[in-house]
Every structure is written in structure tokens, then in C-alpha cells.
């Protein structure tokens, strides 16, 4: 009954999505799901928007060789998220806020957003780690580095294995002149080029900087998570006001 009451009065829903994948030996496999879940708990305290159960699995092609990683792939994730949104659309949802914890999910989420627009709705994709960079450039970080490690410390310090934090980041270069700088990125003569490789061919333990996890603190994580949650609450209030027909129309 409460769901029916909600959709008679509201058309906005919030869905979390993450992944189960390696984030280095120091971090839990569920990092990308734990962080959105924690943010949703914070948001629920200040917002009346309907929050759906988090989708814990994502598209994690390059990391799937690490033990414990669970990969749906971009196509299946697109189908799963699409079905979830279709069901909610049937009940009256028209504004979909997707709180995303994993970069590999972005292509699938974008496709669902295009589908929703064609049906008369609108989707907002909130990639928490990118948003945090805009809120404070000092928070900018890479996969399993200081930013994500700080977030997990802010949630539960016992989830970070401090014995595995120390040590330099080791990236496997493509050659003496093609230097690895990220998951797929390499640098040659000051220019970035992408050479897709499975992550075990790039990093020795699953995390990629440039920020080091040893820079993370619990205080940093708590402040970053609270700031992000507060922003999302504010954003959703503005998102509710959007004229969908005008925003998604072709007249400028």
C-alpha cells in the first residue's frame, strides 16, 4: 500500500548500483557497493524520495580475472537496470536518479537513460567519486587509491587491511617508451593514448593511483561522504522541478 501511495503523489526514484570487484589487497571486494549503500542511508535521513534496493553487481570486464570479482558485463547490466526501471516506470516513476559506485557501469546506465527519455522520462546519473572531485579537488583519486580507501575508512575502518596499504604503486608499462598511467591509458611524448589491457596486466595488486591509499584518513572519508550525501539531497529537490518535456524536447 505504501508504494502505491508514494507513486500517486511522486514520480522520483533513487537507485544505487555498484560492483563486486578487486580494489587492491587492502580493500573489500564490495567497495563499489558499500559506498553507495552508505550514502543512501545518509540520504534517507533527509529526503522523502523512494530509495530502491541497491544493485550490487556491475560490469567489470577488465578486473574479472581477480578472485572474487563478479562480472555481469555491460549488456546484461543494461538489461537488468532497464528491467528495474521499466517496472518502476509502469508504477508511475518518471524521474530516475542512479547513484553509481563503479565506472564500468556508466555505458549501461547511459543506455538506460536514453531508453527512459524515449518513453517520456528522464534519468540522472550520479557518479559519486567524480562528484567528490568537483566538491574538493584534494579528494580526487583512482581505483582503490586514497579517495576510495578514505570512503571505506569513513564507513568502517575495520574493512581496510592496513597491513596491505604500504608500498609503491607498480604499473606494468607497455614498453620502455609507452608508460602506463591508468587502467587503459598510457603516455607517449606527453600525450595520452588508450591501450585496453586486462587489469592484472597493468597493476600488481588491483589498485591504480595516482593517489596512494596510505594518504587516506577516516576524517577525510566521513567529510567526503557527508558532503556528497548532502549534495545529492539538494540535487534531487532541484531534479523534481525539471520540466521533462522541455528538458528532453528538441526545441531550443
What annotation goes with each model-predicted range?
Residues 1-75, 79-95, 103-252:
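Extended, histidine- and acidic-residue-enriched regions that form the cofactor-binding/catalytic faces
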Amino acid at each position: 500500500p505504501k508504494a502505491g501511495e508514494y507513486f500517486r503523489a511522486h514520480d522520483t526514484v533513487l537507485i544505487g548500483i555498484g560492483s563486486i570487484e578487486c580494489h587492491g589487497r587492502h580493500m573489500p571486494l564490495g567497495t563499489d557497493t558499500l559506498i553507495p549503500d552508505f550514502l543512501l542511508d545518509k540520504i534517507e535521513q533527509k529526503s522523502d524520495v523512494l530509495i530502491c534496493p541497491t544493485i550490487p553487481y556491475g560490469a567489470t570486464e577488465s578486473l574479472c580475472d581477480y578472485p572474487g570479482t563478479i562480472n555481469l558485463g555491460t549488456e546484461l547490466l543494461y538489461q537488468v537496470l532497464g528491467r528495474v526501471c521499466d517496472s518502476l516506470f509502469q508504477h508511475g516513476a518518471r524521474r530516475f536518479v542512479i547513484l553509481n559506485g563503479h565506472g564500468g557501469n556508466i555505458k549501461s546506465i547511459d543506455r538506460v537513460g536514453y531508453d527512459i527519455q524515449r518513453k517520456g522520462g528522464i534519468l540522472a546519473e550520479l557518479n559519486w567519486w567524480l562528484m567528490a572531485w568537483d566538491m574538493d579537488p584534494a579528494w580526487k583519486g583512482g581505483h582503490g587509491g586514497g579517495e576510495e580507501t578514505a570512503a571505506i575508512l569513513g564507513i568502517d575502518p575495520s574493512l581496510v587491511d592496513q597491513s596491505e596499504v604500504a608500498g609503491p604503486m607498480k604499473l606494468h608499462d607497455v614498453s620502455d617508451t609507452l608508460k602506463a598511467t591508468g587502467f587503459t591509458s598510457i603516455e607517449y611524448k606527453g600525450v595520452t593514448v588508450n591501450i585496453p589491457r586486462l587489469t592484472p596486466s597493468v597493476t600488481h595488486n588491483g589498485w591504480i593511483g595516482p593517489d596512494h591509499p596510505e594518504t587516506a584518513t577516516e576524517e577525510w572519508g566521513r567529510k567526503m561522504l557527508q558532503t556528497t550525501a548532502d549534495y545529492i539531497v539538494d540535487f534531487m529537490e532541484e531534479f523534481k522541478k525539471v520540466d521533462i518535456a522541455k528538458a528532453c524536447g528538441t526545441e531550443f
